[in-house]
Regions:
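N-terminal targeting/tethering segments
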Residues: 1-107
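A short glycine/proline-enriched turn/edge-strand or helix-cap micro-motif
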Residues: 62, 114-129
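Acidic/polar surface patches and capping/hinge elements
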Residues: 101, 124-158, 173
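Extracytoplasmic/luminal low-complexity segments enriched in Pro/Gly and acidic/polar residues
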Residues: 158-174
Length: 174
């Protein structure tokens, strides 16, 4: 609905603004969104990015529902989980119990947290589609760039980098 669209627009607005400023050397002013950038108005670019964000969020939640990680993939259910999480945290604070993380999540932070958790759940379950990797996939990713850990300037060998390489391949496939 319009509430979901507005939220997603708010999520992408800053990044879109920065992208337009950088790509078109544009200055941010009152008419920024009404300006034309190579034949497309700023508000159209913002709308396109908003729709892409909505599609991504729906894909994540539809997959999570399909896998049984959430029982309801709707925006309303997400909003309810956010409210429930904050109520639970507030109750613990009132009782003097220890809570980890924030006392209260903004909707955007909760969305980021939940998407990150769902992605991690999916990627860590090797029985899920695409998560069992071939040695060729791991090797291709490893050879695509340097793998440097800590203060060491040298490229790590595959066995040292394997966990990170496998995580990256799974996240790309996700």
């Amino acid at each position: 609905g319009s509430k979901e669209y507005q939220l997603c627009m708010d999520l992408v607005k800053y990044d879109v603004k920065m992208e337009i400023q950088k790509r078109y050397d544009a200055l941010y002013g009152e008419d920024f969104w009404e300006q034309s950038y190579e034949g497309q108005y700023g508000y159209e670019i913002l709308a396109d990015h908003t729709v892409e964000k909505i599609k991504y969020i729906h894909a994540v939640y539809d997959l999570a529902k399909e896998c049984g990680d959430v029982s309801d993939s709707s925006y309303e259910a997400l909003e309810q989980r956010w409210k429930d999480e904050n109520a639970e945290r507030s109750e613990k604070v009132a009782k003097g119990e220890v809570i980890y993380g924030l006392k209260e999540y903004t909707f955007q932070l909760y969305l980021d947290y939940e998407i990150s958790t769902l992605k991690e759940q999916y990627c860590n379950d090797l029985t899920r589609e695409g998560m069992k990797l071939t040695e060729a996939e791991v090797l291709e990713c490893y050879e695509s760039r340097d793998w440097i850990f800590g203060g060491n300037e040298e490229n790590a060998d595959l066995e040292t980098a394997r966990v990170a390489v496998e995580r990256e391949v799974r996240e790309q496939k996700y």
